[in-house]
Amino acid sequence: MSKQNKKDWKKFKDEHKEEHKVENEILEEEIDEKSQHQEPALGHPSYTALEEQLTLAEQKAHENWEKSVRALAELDNVRRRMEREVANAHKYGVEKLISALLPVVDSLEQALQLADKNSDPSMHEGLELTMKLFLDALQKFDVEQIDPLGQTFDPQQHEAMSMQPAPGAPPNSVITVFQKGYKLSDRVIRPARVIVSTK
């Protein structure tokens, strides 16, 4: 091949190379545009569709997580409430029975006050023993007698029947107890009925 032919061939090759390069670039741009506007073939979802599905799934998972946390908290609250109710039932379950027995204790106290120790000592002693047995039985169930004579008036445990001046007694103190009160554990079943001193 002559030198002239080689130059012509090279020139021809370079010209066509440029044309092919431009054609390839145009084809690539067309392919890119088509792929952006069309769903991929074979039924595969596009990137944006997958992104939307992922976002929805994450939202649903978060909602379900919040529901489960709330349900667990509610379950824990119910468990604690039931434990408290069972404990209170054990602690205060005998309250109605104790309240029904208090008039019997009051009657025994009145009988002790009225019984003449000198004329019938065995009767008085029997009443004292019965009263002691009764109070001991109540104490086994965590029942405590409220006898506030000489104490400062406490509206949580005492019921003031009246107020009167009492020389020598500090103001607002209990000077007479009409009826003793009773507590079951820390709950007052019946307040003590009292007279309170004034200034």
UniProtKB/Swiss-Prot annotation:
Keywords: Chaperone, Cytoplasm, Stress response. Residues 1-24 have a biased composition (Basic and acidic residues). GO terms for cellular component: cytosol. Residues 1-47 are annotated as: Disordered. It is found in: Cytoplasm. Transmembrane segments: none annotated. SUPFAM superfamilies: Coiled-coil domain of nucleotide exchange factor GrpE, Head domain of nucleotide exchange factor GrpE. One of its GO terms (biological process) is protein folding. GO terms for molecular function: adenyl-nucleotide exchange factor activity; protein homodimerization activity; protein-folding chaperone binding; unfolded protein binding. InterPro entries: GrpE (IPR000740), GrpE_coiled_coil (IPR013805), GrpE_head (IPR009012). Its main location: cytoplasm. Homodimer. PANTHER family: GRPE PROTEIN, GRPE PROTEIN HOMOLOG, MITOCHONDRIAL. Belongs to the GrpE family. HAMAP family: GrpE. Participates actively in the response to hyperosmotic and heat shock by preventing the aggregation of stress-denatured proteins, in association with DnaK and GrpE. It is the nucleotide exchange factor for DnaK and may function as a thermosensor. Unfolded proteins bind initially to DnaJ; upon interaction with the DnaJ-bound protein, DnaK hydrolyzes its bound ATP, resulting in the formation of a stable complex. GrpE releases ADP from DnaK; ATP binding to DnaK triggers the release of the substrate protein, thus completing the reaction cycle. NCBIfam families: PRK14139.1 (NF010737), PRK14140.1 (NF010738), PRK14144.1 (NF010742), PRK14150.1 (NF010748). This is Protein GrpE. It comes from Legionella pneumophila (strain Paris).
